[in-house]
Amino acid sequence: MLLGITAQGNNPDAAVDPRFGRCRYFWIVDTVSGQQEILENPNGQNSGGAGIQSAQLMVSKSVEAVLTGNIGPNASQVLTPAGIKIYTGITGKVTEVIDRFKSGDLKTV
């Protein structure tokens, strides 16, 4: 499964960013192959529409699930129709969150 995880940094010990639209980085992780792509969020400094634009970025990257601390209703309205599962209330290091996802410990909204 292809995950989009919000992160505060671009290293394996980075914490999950509690913000979706204005997170610093997105980690795109393939849970099958283990491949990872780290993207600096181009929408983080936008004055408006960051959530929608970040959601559109996740759709364009073909992610199947988004893992974040919080997400706004506008971003959800982009992700949900695209069939992307949303996991909120996520905390901890990105690498730990990937392991928790793989073990089935996370619940969708």
Where does each model-flagged region fall?
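N-terminal first-folded block
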Residues: L2-N43
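Short secondary-structure boundary segments
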Residues: A7-G9, G69-N70, I90-T91
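C-terminal structural segments of small proteins and small subunits
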Residues: P73-V109
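Compact, glycine-rich, soluble single-domain proteins
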Residues: L39-E64
